[in-house]
């Protein structure tokens, strides 16, 4: 399959994959060798190849890519000149071909998926292609359970994940030694002696994110361990394999649990923080304006592992979402975690629902273009310090002592999210809000553009995804800049 090939060109923006069974292996990788771009497997007497972008099978004109795919077809079919067909949701042409081409839009019934696995086991070959992140973006469906290719490939020990692949320069490279990049092999080594290469560790963590089946294998290795979540004092470094596996599995598993069974994550009491159980949880009535763009602050905080209840009392909740937490950056790609790598959660709203997360966070609502004004009650939360420059009724000297660990200062053009410790002794929040409003308006004046209708957001975080600060919504920076001096 790889004779005379050491790299292939980058076509489009491919996704990433995971591989974990003994008979499966990575074929092509990008910068991150733990997340292949193409994988293959032997299954019974047959073979299966998958690549995370359809451009490689859609009339490739590049000479190297064309040669590579020709050799892939020969390897998969085990024929020099294979007869090739297109996979459809039936078995009509299977006996007449050596190889079936499977595009991402061909969704198979469970009956045909079972028959396809048997056909491969008896000596058939399949080449599958999909852009997994693009498929999720277009369909809004679950990659692991709703994409037919992924359901079949899970039986072979490999699946698509949801990340983008980055090349090495303008190419992807042939995968390194399979023992390093096969998550199953790496997991067995971890189980035996607690060690693993950096590539292998990354492969295990990514496969655990991608595959519920593989996650069960990881749980059998780390479930008996009592582990602290990552904190500034006890970071989870790349060498801390078992800790990072625990974090990866916990971060995936909690989402499938009933709300009543969700517990706080170890370390969440440190960041983003919690509030003593003796402090009363409150209920608030809110009126939400659908014309307001972006996250709508509530001045409320959900503690880690506790349950928030929402009841819509007026209006249609369709098109509205509820967000828990402002620390939106994910850290899976970082070599060291000083907080949990993914701690915010967004859910679509219904007329009545409960929400809990292991980390909690400030509570926000967000409208869409199709949503309408609604009224609701929210309970199970604590109050957070919130200054709003347009709310003349705020008693700031009382507000700043609200018990939640995170606070917000809201101007017309900028909203700051900072630790509550940064505002406990702040006497003039209006001066802060006006200063940052001026920063935004002056920036827009200099650029010759209008001030955006949606206020910018600035969030201080324990650890961010890139650099010391980065742009986006919200703008992210280190928590040290919000630490009071003196």
Give a label for each model feature.
Residues 362-364, 368-412, 422:
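Exposed low-complexity, polar/acidic, P/S/T/G-rich flexible segments that act as propeptides
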Residues 397-486:
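Juxtacatalytic substrate-recognition/specificity segment
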Residues 165, 171-265, 406-424, 431-443:
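Activation corresponds to long, low-complexity, non-globular regions
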Residues 258-386:
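Beta-strand-enriched, solvent-exposed domains that form extended recognition/catalytic surfaces
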Residues 33, 54-58, 105-108, 132-136, ...:
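Solvent-exposed loop/turn segments at secondary-structure junctions
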Residues 41-55, 66, 72-75, 93-146:
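Short alpha-beta junction capping motif
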Residues 1-44, 59-61, 92, 154-215:
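Catalytic beta-strand/loop cores that center a nucleophilic Ser/Cys/Thr
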Residues 82-95, 348-351:
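A short, well-structured beta->alpha microelement
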């Amino acid at each position: 399959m790889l004779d005379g090939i050491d790299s292939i060109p980058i076509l489009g923006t491919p996704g990433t994959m995971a591989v974990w069974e003994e008979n499966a292996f990575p074929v092509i990788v990008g910068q991150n060798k733990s997340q292949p771009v193409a994988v293959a497997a032997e299954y019974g007497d047959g073979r299966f190849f998958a690549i995370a972008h359809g451009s490689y099978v859609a009339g490739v004109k590049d000479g190297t890519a064309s040669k590579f795919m020709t050799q892939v077809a020969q390897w998969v079919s085990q024929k020099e000149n294979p007869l090739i067909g297109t996979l459809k949701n039936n078995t009509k042409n299977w006996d007449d071909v050596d190889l079936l081409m499977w595009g991402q839009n061909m969704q198979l019934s469970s009956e045909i998926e079972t028959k396809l696995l048997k056909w491969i086991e008896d000596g058939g070959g399949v080449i599958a292609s999909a852009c997994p992140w693009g498929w999720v973006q277009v369909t809004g469906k679950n990659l692991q359970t709703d994409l037919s290719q992924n359901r079949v490939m899970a039986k072979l020990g490999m699946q698509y994940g949801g990340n983008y692949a980055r090349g090495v320069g303008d190419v992807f490279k042939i995968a390194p030694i399979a023992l390093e990049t096969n998550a199953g092999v790496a997991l067995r080594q971890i189980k035996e002696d607690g060690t693993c290469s950096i590539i292998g560790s990354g492969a295990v963590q990514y496969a655990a994110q991608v595959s519920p089946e593989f996650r069960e294998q990881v749980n059998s290795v780390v479930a008996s361990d009592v582990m602290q979540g990552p904190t500034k004092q006890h970071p989870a470094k790349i060498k801390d394999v078992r800790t990072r596996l625990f974090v990866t599995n916990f971060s995936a598993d909690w989402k499938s649990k009933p709300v009543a069974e969700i517990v706080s994550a170890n370390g969440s009491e440190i960041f983003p923080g919690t509030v003593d159980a003796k402090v009363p949880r409150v209920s608030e009535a809110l009126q939400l304006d659908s014309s307001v763009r972006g996250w709508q602050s509530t001045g409320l905080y959900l503690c880690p592992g506790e349950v928030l209840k929402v009841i819509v009392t007026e209006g249609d909740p369709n098109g509205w979402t509820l967000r828990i937490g402002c620390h939106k950056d994910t850290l899976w790609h970082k070599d060291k975690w000083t907080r949990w790598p993914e701690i915010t959660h967004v859910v679509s709203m219904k007329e009545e629902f409960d929400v809990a997360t292991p980390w909690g966070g400030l509570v926000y609502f967000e409208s869409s273009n199709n949503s309408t004004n609604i009224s609701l009650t929210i309970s199970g939360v604590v109050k957070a310090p919130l200054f709003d420059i347009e709310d003349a009724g705020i008693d700031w000297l009382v507000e700043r002592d609200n018990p939640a660990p995170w606070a917000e200062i809201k101007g017309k053009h900028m909203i700051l999210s900072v630790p509550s410790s940064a505002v406990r002794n702040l006497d003039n929040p209006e001066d802060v809000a006006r200063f940052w409003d001026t920063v935004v308006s002056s920036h827009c004046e200099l650029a010759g553009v209008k001030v955006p209708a949606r206020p910018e957001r600035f969030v201080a975080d324990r650890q961010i995804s890139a650099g010391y600060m980065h742009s986006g919504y919200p703008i992210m920076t280190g928590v040290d800049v919000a630490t009071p001096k003196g």
